[in-house]
Amino acid sequence: MPTSTPSPVFGNQEFHYTREDFQQVRERLYRLTGISLAESKAQLVYSRLSRRLRLLRLGSFAEYFTHLDREPGEQQLFVNALTTNLTAFFRERHHFPLLADLARRQLQRHRPLRIWSAAASTGEEPYSIAITLVEALGSFDPPVKIVASDIDTGVLDCARQGVYPLERLEQMPAPLKKRFFLRGTGPNAGKARVVEELRQLVEFRQINLLEADWSIAGELDAIFCRNVMIYFDKPTQTRLLERMVALLRPEGLFFAGHSENFVHASHLVRSVGQTVYSPA
């Protein structure tokens, strides 16, 4: 009896790509990161991973999975290729006045501020946090510690450099651009770099949120974990939220993304603003 071969997900592709290939990618990514890829992401997966196949000169996704199993270092590159890195300076702008108010209150108590940006991507979020604190506290040497982490080592390298195309700064007020960025010239024309004083306020680390040890000390004043939870299933969301809330001070703030809500976790957090929560 003849056996049928899996049909490609899309026609006329450079690499043969089946539903089985996509399901295997979904399973591997979930196992490594806890991220649940939606069925609608099949084309995105092909686009991202086909670059790896070309670079490695592999002929099929089956060959790539074999390579993935044989080369431990490829797992991180696999994760880097598939994790989404959509970000912007002062994204979800309504969060930053609340952070500034929190900073001023803590300064009055003579208490240093500790903040974790848990999905830092290419750095726009932690640098927006740093700018907010410098502006609120009136000093380039504020009593703050900002830890910024991501699972993707590639974006963290970009974040540490702090170099961005000028168009990324288009929506930023001119005084902030002038104070916190250096405009490139010559071969760096069309780019801007975060000033060194601001870069020194942020410590970048590679952290997989599914790891048992985050190496993040407690008593945090704020955690930014925005537009991350949507990639996890509800049980994983609850486990992560429980761990993060345990790191916050009682008056600390948890900043979530615009498409996230934690109605299912009201025993852990209470809403104190638009997508802003405190420990319950």
UniProtKB/Swiss-Prot annotation:
Annotated binding of S-adenosyl-L-methionine, by residue: N85, T87, R91, E125, D150, N208, L209, R226, N227
An annotated Gene Ontology molecular function: protein-glutamate O-methyltransferase activity
Protein's GO biological process: chemotaxis; methylation
Protein EC: 2.1.1.80
Disulfide bonds: none
Gene3D superfamilies to which the protein is assigned, alphabetical: Chemotaxis receptor methyltransferase CheR, N-terminal domain (1.10.155.10), Vaccinia Virus protein VP39 (3.40.50.150)
Domain CheR-type methyltransferase: 10-280
UniProt cross-references to CDD domains, sorted A to Z: AdoMet_MTases (cd02440)
Annotated catalysed reactions: L-glutamyl-[protein] + S-adenosyl-L-methionine = [protein]-L-glutamate 5-O-methyl ester + S-adenosyl-L-homocysteine
Root EC class: transferase
An annotated GO cellular component: methyl accepting chemotaxis protein complex
Cross-referenced InterPro entries: Bact_Chemotaxis_MeTrfase, Chemotaxis_MeTrfase_CheR, CheR_C, CheR_MeTrfase, CheR_N, CheR_N_sf, SAM-dependent_MTases_sf
Function in brief: Methylation of the methyl-accepting chemotaxis proteins (MCP) to form gamma-glutamyl methyl ester residues in MCP. It specifically targets the McpB chemoreceptor.
Subunit structure comment from the entry: Interacts with the C-terminal pentapeptide GWEEF of the methyl-accepting chemotaxis protein McpB.
Protein name stated in the entry: Chemotaxis protein methyltransferase 2
Name of the gene this protein is made from: cheR2
